[in-house]
């Protein structure tokens, strides 16, 4: 089983505690995702002008990009309360009914991992989203009866990293659908600088940029790396983070300039050295790495593919010439004739 990685995009308890102090409250402070931000500003202003609950919102994209943060921002901009839960927590229809009946008019209900709702719970959610009503069964057997309960108008925000797992009936009930994209290094630099200022960390623009470029396009990773570099700087550099300090801290953490850690590099190296660069089936690759298939597909591969180091084909996984160069290896002539010489890893 893979231990928690410093560049993992999944949330930890430390992330949750730290995020609470640096989480933006307004759209103006929500950096990056400009198309989403501009659209949401219009939808929010229109709903407030009409005095109505905003339409239901589905937010999807890779983990760590700010889906939960955006839900908090939306509720703050609407001036309403936010109730937060997740799909696995809502086990029974009664659990969902309890949440819905406690909402005030125009409140926002945020359901993380909404793709993990059970079919029974989804059936209760459909009329709640469409008609602001739910049907609850009271009693058992022949004495059972259905009671219709009216709900106040509310906005449901569903978040998921696996939009393809949503059922069509549920997906179709969202009037607003937003995809969050990976952040650019420039956007992440602004996020790191903002977080450093809020946390009272002495960080130069060059130090912030170095942290940002190794953060895999993900704010959660950028903020986590900032905290680890802060630890290093407090012990080794009197609390001051500049470019050399950030680079030295990343060397200690074994996070290279592409944002890869040892597990990323081990996967690329295994494909090159054991499978001649691929293609190799995911099951064989998982066995060679002593990792679960799900870990490869959901945790390791997405960023390698997105950055152009790995290709997923019908015959299996293949590395690209970029992977050879990144590992300091010469690219085989049959794969990319005339390509350059190997580069430095760090």
UniProtKB/Swiss-Prot annotation:
Superkingdom of this protein's organism: Bacteria
Residues involved in ATP binding: 22-23, 64, 67-69, 130-132, 173, 183, 220
Residue segments, region Large ATPase domain (RuvB-L): 1-183
Residue numbers spanned by region Small ATPAse domain (RuvB-S): 184-254
CC terms in the record's Gene Ontology section: cytoplasm; Holliday junction resolvase complex
SUPFAM superfamilies per UniProt: P-loop containing nucleoside triphosphate hydrolases, Winged helix' DNA-binding domain
Entry EC no(s): 3.6.4.-
Gene Ontology MF term list: ATP binding; ATP hydrolysis activity; four-way junction DNA binding; four-way junction helicase activity
Entries under Gene3D superfamilies matching the protein: 1.10.8.60, P-loop containing nucleotide triphosphate hydrolases, Winged helix-like DNA-binding domain superfamily/Winged helix DNA-binding domain
Predominant location category: cytoplasm
InterPro entries: AAA+_ATPase, AAA_lid_4, DNA_helicase_Holl-junc_RuvB, P-loop_NTPase, RuvB-like_N, RuvB_C, WH-like_DNA-bd_sf, WH_DNA-bd_sf
Family indicated by similarity: Belongs to the RuvB family.
Protein name as catalogued: Holliday junction branch migration complex subunit RuvB
Organism, as annotated: Xanthomonas euvesicatoria pv. vesicatoria (strain 85-10)
């Amino acid at each position: 089983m893979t231990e928690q990685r410093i560049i993992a995009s999944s949330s930890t308890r430390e992330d949750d505690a730290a995020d609470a102090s640096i989480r933006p409250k307004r759209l103006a402070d929500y950096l990056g995702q400009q198309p989403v931000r501009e659209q949401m500003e219009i939808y929010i202003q229109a709903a407030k002008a009409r005095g109505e609950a905003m339409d239901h919102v589905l937010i999807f994209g890779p983990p760590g990009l700010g889906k939960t943060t955006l839900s908090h921002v939306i509720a703050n901009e609407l001036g309403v309360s936010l109730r937060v839960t997740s799909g696995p927590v809502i086990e029974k229809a009664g659990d969902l009914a309890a949440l819905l009946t406690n909402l005030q008019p125009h409140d926002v209900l945020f359901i993380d991992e909404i793709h993990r709702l059970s079919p029974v719970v989804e059936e209760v959610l459909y009329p709640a989203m469409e008609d602001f009503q739910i049907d609850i069964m009271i009693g058992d057997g022949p004495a059972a009866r259905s009671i219709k309960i009216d709900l106040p108008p509310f906005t449901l925000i569903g978040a998921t990293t696996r939009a393809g797992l949503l059922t069509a009936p549920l997906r179709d009930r969202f009037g607003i659908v937003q995809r969050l994209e990976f952040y650019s290094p420039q956007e992440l630099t602004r996020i790191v600088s903002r977080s450093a200022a809020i946390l009272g960390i002495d960080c130069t623009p060059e130090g912030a940029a170095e942290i940002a470029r190794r953060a895999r396009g993900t704010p959660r990773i950028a903020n986590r790396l900032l905290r680890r570099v802060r630890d290093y700087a407090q012990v080794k550099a009197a609390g001051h983070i500049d470019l050399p300090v950030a680079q030295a801290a990343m060397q200690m953490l074994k996070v290279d300039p592409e944002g890869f850690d040892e597990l990323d590099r081990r996967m690329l190296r295994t494909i090159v050295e054991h499978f001649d660069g691929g293609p190799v089936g995911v099951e064989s690759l998982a066995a060679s790495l002593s990792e679960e298939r799900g870990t490869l597909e959901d945790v390791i591969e997405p960023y390698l593919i997105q950055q152009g180091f790995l290709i997923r084909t019908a015959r299996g996984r293949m590395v690209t010439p970029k992977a050879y160069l990144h590992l300091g290896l010469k690219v085989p002539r049959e794969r990319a004739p005339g390509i350059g010489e190997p580069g430095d890893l760090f």
